[in-house]
């Protein structure tokens, strides 16, 4: 029987009850992580939970969990639900309290829920590439926090779906930031470009992996801003995330990127990613 982790206990889905006064439900007052499972093992799980606790700290949320404890509960959940290929979703909110914008006084216990799901890797997207669109970035100014406030991302993703695309690559003015659920990269003249780490983007775990792979393959990796025009005239474009892995974008706003085919550097990064899965899953 499927199990869900809820506030310190492993329960069945039918027993997983959340209050209507939970601040995650009322205000989006919380954080989350999404962790990939390959061959029954957790991929880059330490990095994910370090970011999870950083996000908690940034919003003044004391979870009373260590990285090691979070990894242990995740392992139990994967084993209980017999997940071979899939993911864990975990979120923490500021807890249950009467509706008031300010933090609850006195403090209440955070609410933590985690669950698993099985799903295949995106083989078709990885092999053949996807269509993308560009859209103005209308999100808040703390995109470095992996918060539950995802309305801007949802609207961007829906815009992509409306135009038969898989991802929406966002921009503030003419400066490309990131995808609605991914980091974005332009590859030009053998160099990988991606937006620098600051409050405008999430420091994606797969982004960190790609940077390490680029170093291993001696591919120049520059963390600097670039424009929408630069992106559209790149030799290759990719987006990356826990679920998307290293996905090539072969068409943007209806126009092909370069010759409309998956490029050689993308293939190198995908090759390196496969090796990274083997060496960084526990």
UniProtKB/Swiss-Prot annotation:
Its EC number is 2.6.1.21. Its cofactor is pyridoxal 5'-phosphate. Pyridoxal 5'-phosphate binds at residues 51, 178. Disulfide bonds: none annotated. InterPro entries: Aminotrans_IV (IPR001544), Aminotrans_IV_CS (IPR018300), Aminotransferase-like (IPR036038), BCAT-like_C (IPR043132), BCAT-like_N (IPR043131), Class-IV_PLP-Dep_Aminotrnsfr (IPR050571), D_amino_transT (IPR005784). GO terms for cellular component: cytosol. Substrate binds at residues 32, 99, 101. Signal peptide: none annotated. Pfam families: Aminotran_4 (PF01063). The keyword Transferase applies. GO terms for biological process: D-amino acid biosynthetic process; D-amino acid catabolic process. It catalyses: D-alanine + 2-oxoglutarate = D-glutamate + pyruvate. Keywords: Aminotransferase, Pyridoxal phosphate, Transferase. Belongs to the class-IV pyridoxal-phosphate-dependent aminotransferase family. Homodimer. Acts on the D-isomers of alanine, leucine, aspartate, glutamate, aminobutyrate, norvaline and asparagine. The enzyme transfers an amino group from a substrate D-amino acid to the pyridoxal phosphate cofactor to form pyridoxamine and an alpha-keto acid in the first half-reaction. The second half-reaction is the reverse of the first, transferring the amino group from the pyridoxamine to a second alpha-keto acid to form the product D-amino acid via a ping-pong mechanism. This is an important process in the formation of D-alanine and D-glutamate, which are essential bacterial cell wall components. This is D-alanine aminotransferase. The lineage of its organism: Bacteria, Bacillati, Bacillota, Bacilli, Bacillales. The gene is dat.
């Amino acid at each position: 029987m499927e199990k869900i982790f809820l506030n310190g206990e492993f329960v069945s889905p039918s027993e997983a009850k959340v209050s209507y006064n939970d601040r995650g439900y009322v205000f989006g007052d919380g954080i989350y992580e999404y962790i990939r499972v390959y061959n029954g093992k957790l991929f880059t799980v330490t990095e994910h939970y370090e970011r999870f606790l950083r996000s908690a700290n940034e919003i003044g949320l004391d979870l009373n969990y260590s990285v090691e404890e979070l990894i242990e509960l995740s392992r139990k959940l994967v084993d209980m639900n017999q997940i071979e290929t899939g993911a864990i979703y975990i979120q923490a909110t500021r807890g249950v309290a009467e509706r008031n914008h300010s933090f609850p006084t006195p403090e209440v216990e955070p609410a933590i829920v985690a669950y698993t799901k099985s799903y295949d890797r995106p083989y078709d997207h990885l092999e053949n590439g996807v269509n993308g669109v560009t859209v103005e970035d209308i999100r808040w100014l703390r995109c470095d926090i992996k918060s539950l406030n995802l309305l801007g991302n949802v609207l961007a993703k829906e815009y992509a779906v409306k135009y038969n695309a898989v991802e929406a690559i966002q921009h503030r003015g003419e400066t490309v930031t990131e995808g609605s659920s991914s980091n974005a990269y332009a590859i030009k003249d053998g160099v990988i470009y991606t937006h620098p780490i600051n409050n405008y983007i999430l420091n994606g775990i797969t982004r960190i992996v790609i940077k390490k792979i680029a170093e291993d393959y001696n591919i120049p990796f520059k963390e600097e801003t670039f424009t929408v025009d630069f992106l559209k005239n790149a030799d290759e474009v990719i987006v990356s995330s826990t679920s998307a892995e290293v996905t090539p974008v072969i068409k943007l706003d209806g126009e092909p990127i370069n010759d409309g085919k998956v490029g050689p550097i993308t293939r190198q990064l995908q090759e390196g990613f496969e090796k990274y899965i083997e060496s960084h899953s526990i």
